[in-house]
From Swiss-Prot:
Source organism of this protein record: Arabidopsis thaliana (Mouse-ear cress)
EC code: 2.6.1.52
Binding-site list for L-glutamate: 101
Highest taxon above the source species: Eukaryota
GO molecular function, one term: O-phospho-L-serine:2-oxoglutarate aminotransferase activity
Keyword Plastid: yes
Signal peptide: none
Protein name stated in the entry: Phosphoserine aminotransferase 2, chloroplastic
Gene Ontology biological process terms, A to Z: L-serine biosynthetic process
Alphabetized UniProt keyword annotations: Acetylation, Amino-acid biosynthesis, Aminotransferase, Chloroplast, Plastid, Pyridoxal phosphate, Serine biosynthesis, Transferase, Transit peptide
Similarity section: Belongs to the class-V pyridoxal-phosphate-dependent aminotransferase family. SerC subfamily.
The organelle targeting sequence, given as a residue range: 1-50
Modification N-acetylalanine, positions: 51
Highest classification ranks of the organism: Eukaryota, Viridiplantae, Streptophyta, Embryophyta, Tracheophyta
């Protein structure tokens, strides 16, 4: 990368120089020691020039983070946020200091929505809401907004998150589990032809990708009730591939796995479904309130929305979700092949046709070696590989921000570990 220059104003205290990414579209920026640093005093500018050199995975100070969420963010996005942190675009303030009703933040949230609409090709008949409370809060918001206390709703439970959504809905309506994978330890997705849907169900709810168990819907069921809608929790595969939004009444997702930091929940809802909340619905769970106020009814998670906007911009510059999906398929194929070709040393319990592109759970034939595997991987700067406490084993979350080189390093380590312990 050619040397770049970043100038900003500082106060009496010297500031740590920031690194300006060369392009928001590049996933990893690698750098060497700055060759020019001129620190000055108040009202004078500071000029920082950074030379960079290419390396394999990323800067040597950073680990390869396989966390399920909060998860890794694109390094170039982090560096862009760093360069804007002190003085966003000459505004004289950080995004964290802005009024959420000021013109600066309005431009941020409006661009974030516009870019997300472009990424997912969201029809104009849908509203986009930037909310708080995580996807878990939506487990209650959905029945409160879409049905009455005695209304029927259907749930397909393919993992822990689908199960939690169903249990929360029991407080507010009459939900029914029409299929559960619990008896087979959540390793499958049902065939849709055999589903016995309730004829009067207001909605059919699925979790499109189960983060813990690594099960992903590759297609989506049709709702038999002509007045019902399909609802999907897409927290852990949101913006990982193209989705036909028109098939759904509501799509919701916590941002912290694939498109931003924790603290932001995105809801995409068909407009005709808004405005039917029950009287008991808390104001913060009423979709109409948030829609009428453009997600600004109360103070939103401003910095989190800003970060999501940077991620959306990055995904667009990569060529959109079709290109992103190709990259994700390549990473997942590499890792699953390593597991399947290990002659049973590594094992993935999930049925091959529904294996997640995002979350790859696996175990060792010799379970007593799993702790050693995680320990040795950490020494190689590959972290957060321990499986969820409810299932054990290992789990590699390889979201959009995970570079191919990170998966390649994990696969090389797996093969070396097998050679030493088989």
């Amino acid at each position: 990368m050619a040397a770049s220059t970043n100038s900003f104003l500082i106060g009496n205290q010297t500031q740590i120089p920031s690194l300006k990414p060369k392009s928001i579209s590049q996933s990893f920026i690698h750098f060497t020691k700055p060759n020019t640093i001129n620190l000055t005093t108040r009202t004078k500018s500071v000029s920082i020039r950074c030379a960079s050199a290419s390396t394999t995975v990323g800067s040597e100070q950073r680990v390869i983070n396989f966390a399920a969420g909060p998860a890794a963010l694109p390094e170039n996005v982090l560096l862009k946020a760093q360069s804007d942190l002190y003085n966003w675009r000459g505004s004289g303030m950080s995004v964290m200091e802005m009024s959420h009703r000021g013109k600066e933040f309005l431009s941020i949230i409006q661009k974030a929505e516009s870019d997300l609409r472009q990424l997912l090709e969201i029809p104009s008949e849908y509203s986009v809401l930037f909310l708080q409370g995580g996807a878990t809060t939506q487990f209650a918001a959905l029945p409160l907004n879409l049905c009455k206390s005695d209304d029927s709703v259907d749930y397909i439970v393919t993992g822990s998150w689908g199960d939690k959504a169903f249990k929360e809905a029991k407080k507010y309506c009459n939900p029914k589990v029409i299929w559960s994978g619990k008896s087979e330890k959540y390793t499958k997705v049902p065939t849709f032809d055999g589903l016995e849907q309730s004829s009067d169900a207001k909605y059919l709810h699925i979790c499109a990708n189960e983060t813990i168990h690594g099960v992903e819907f590759k297609d989506y069921p049709l709702v038999e009730n002509p007045d019902g809608v399909l609802i999907a929790d897409m927290s852990s595969n949101f913006c990982s591939k193209p989705v036909d939004v028109s098939k759904f009444g509501v799509i919701y997702a916590g941002a912290q796995k694939n498109v931003g930091p924790s603290g932001v929940t995105i809801v995409i809802i068909r407009k005709d479904l808004i405005g039917n909340a029950r009287d008991i619905t808390p104001v913060m769970l009423d979709y109409k309130i948030h829609d009428e106020n453009s997600s600004l009814y109360n103070t939103p998670p401003c910095f989190g929305i800003y970060m999501c906007g940077l991620v959306f911009d990055d995904l667009l510059e990569q060529g959109g979700l079709k290109e992103v999906e190709k990259k994700n398929q390549r990473k997942a194929e590499l890792l699953y092949n390593a597991i399947d070709e290990s002659r049973g040393f590594f094992r993935c319990p999930v049925e091959k046709s529904v294996r997640s592109l995002m979350n790859v759970p696996f175990t060792l034939e010799k379970s007593e070696l799993e702790a050693e595997f995680i320990k040795e991987a950490a020494k190689e700067k590959m972290v957060q590989l321990k499986g969820h406490r409810s299932v054990g084993g290992m789990r590699a979350s390889i979201y959009n921000a995970m570079p191919l080189a990170g998966v390649e390093k994990l696969v090389a380590f797996m093969k070396d570990f097998q050679a030493r312990h088989a």
